[in-house]
Amino acid sequence: MLVKIYPENPNPREIKKITQIIEDGGVVIYPTDTIYGIGCDISQPKAVARLAKIQGLDMDKAYFSFIFNDLSQISEYTKPMSNAAFKLLKRNVPGPFTFIFEANNNIPKLFKTRRKTVGIRVPDNNIIRSIVSELGRPLLSSSVHDVEDEVAEYITDPELIHERYGNVVDAVIDGGYGDNQPSTVIDCITDEFEIIREGKGEIK
């Protein structure tokens, strides 16, 4: 299913439709402020396993991030962060960044693999943030493209994304052409903040 949603003014009815698909255990593809993302409800293990299978990822090694609507729920999933880290977030979100923090015990047991960290995203995109706000909890997210592959045209054009993934996901949101750059990733485990992947956007 390909669903057109305008990022400037997302239709609440369409937002509710996509949110219901996610709540029912669906996997969806959506625009962000960088590359299109693919994600599901973090609280549904079957959906998470399906997402990993679609992406061809080993859950022990897979890298996922959590998409939030704002900063209000982040502390529910990370260990306490320093004032410096919180100020870094406030200066740069919403924006094209992934911030790596230590995960706390509230992360679903499914993610208690070798990874003890969590990637935090608050994209500057009204569509996905409206969906997460309606859902009431963060969305487990991965980029549509394989990080080892070059960014191809199919992952910037939602119609081509639908042609490629439409038979394995429950919905693809057409929010216009996506970007061809991934997010910039910042390690915030300590206050010696380190950029571990250069992507779209400059840290303030």
Where in this protein do the model-derived segments appear?
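Active-site-adjacent structural elements in enzyme catalytic cores
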Residues: 1-204
